[in-house]
Amino acid sequence: VLILVATVIHGNERSGREAFQRFFKILTDEKLPIRAHIVGIQGNIEAWRRNVRYVDEDLNRLWTREHIRRIRMGAFHPRTREEKILVKLVQAIRHYRSKLRPRQLIWLDLHCTSSPRGTFVVSTRHHANLFLASQLRIPLVLGLDHILHGTAIRFFSEIRNAVSLAIEGGQIGDPRAVHVHHAVIWTALKAARLIPREYFDIVAPHEKFLTEISEGLPHKLLVRYAHFIDSTYQFKMLPGFRNFDYVRKGMLLATQWDGPVYAPISGHLLMPLYQPQGGEGFYIAREIKH
């Protein structure tokens, strides 16, 4: 099994990088016998140095089939910083897959949101993805892969024998997001049966932590609406909204160049945008009861 832990795909979402470094130190210091090859991926280092989401364009919207096909053919000519990074990442991943020939690949993409209470896992509906996601003890969000194009988890979910999840650790800059990402890595390893049973006691506190921070939140949601924007929209979210807040149809949520923005449907608010960069102002999801 090859596990790729992706960090700073968005440069200002820094907790995943720190969490992986913490995880890797424990792994090497304790010499734990993990049944997998684990590789940390540092995505947009240029954006990380500047502490911004991206420099030229969103790296997590570039993982399209056409881009990957052209990179593999040597026919992709990058124009932006993020396109150059994409080429390096695709080539590095191809190298590890070719060298190790794993029976399974697991892509864990560590992110944060610009709004409070943003701890959840994003998955596609593929069975293997759903199984692993359901073991992480945090809310599960479905449907984003049909709304957002060019994301890494969508690309990896279409690879044979691959599992891909995006983990939102919490609000950008919140120290607890580091703990969430660290806990998720350990919990995912146990769920994938890559840790010997005699080491389960190492994972137990992480599972307890994830269960506690998810208390009172919906277990499973389906995204039903995305409010797309660009830099010309002058979009501004009203202050005070948090992830999972319940909003009713017609409720005032934001303003933009053409006037007020009202909730088009009722549901749980996800990822309300409180940073200058981003292509989506907010999402609305509905809880899946069954």
Predicted regions and their residues:
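Structured catalytic-domain cores with a bias toward divalent-metal coordination
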Residues: 1-290
